[in-house]
Amino acid sequence: MTQPLPWEKNTAAPVPPAPEPVPLDAYTAPAAPEPELVPLDIYDAPVPAPKPAKPLVDIDSLNPAQREAVLTTEGPLLVLAGAGSGKTRVLTFRIAHMLGDLGVKPWQVLAITFTNKAAAEMRERLAALIPNGTRGMWVCTFHAMCVRMLREDADLLGYTGQFTIYDDDDSKRMVRDIMQALGIEQKQFPINMIRSKISSAKNAMIGPEDMLKSADSPNDKKAAQVYMELERRLRAANAMDFDDLLVRTLELLRTRPEVLDKYQERFRYISVDEYQDTNHVQ
């Protein structure tokens, strides 16, 4: 037998021995423990109520009577108290509570004051209580409210939206001119008396014709005559005096149901400061 040459020898690596067989259960993970059984009745236990959110308005800073007024937000509410007792503070806290804690929208609130200064102070107080939360809310005087309404719908009463507002001096000047044109002597019929009677009639919703019919004194008759001419001239000039702003707005709301519905739908909460000073038309 021929011997293989040296370079023909098998130089392959030796074959390693076969691994020992491993039991099958060595690869099986240990079984997880059985879960504990939970009694069924724990799912029926009452869920604790969430803690109420802290009010945005510091109600605790109010006395019991003030707190009751602030928290009474539905239905009519009349606050009777002496001067300096905090009525305006209650009013502003009540509005802030509605906006900040109850989710009332700013445009649903109308707050009325008697002076521009009081309106500005109320806006400042509300801004301090709820910063950036009063946009769209009306905080104004009766006359300013009426101007806003009339600017939008005065055409329904025969005016244009750009009507002129006569201040006290303008009105007095026009009454003086009318008295001169009618030959009414100011010495016998003082202009302030004439204007006062006309203003009272307007705020009682009495027109010049009705005033003349019911006049039972020379003063009332002269005032009614001036009143009639004053109305004619104001209409011709597309103008209103301060009394007209109130009277025409009331006329608008009484004679135009669609306008009344619009504002009733918008203003869900109306607050009036110094309500005891309001007159009939207000």
Where are these regions (language model features)?
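N-terminal pre-P-loop "Q-motif" helix
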Residues: 59-74
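Short alpha-helical elements of helix-turn-helix
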Residues: 64-67, 93, 280-281
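Charged catalytic and DNA/RNA-contacting regions of genome-maintenance
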Residues: 273
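A basic/glycine-biased coupling hinge at the interface between accessory DNA-binding modules
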Residues: 2-12, 16, 21-30, 34-57, ...
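Walker A/P-loop
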Residues: 74-94
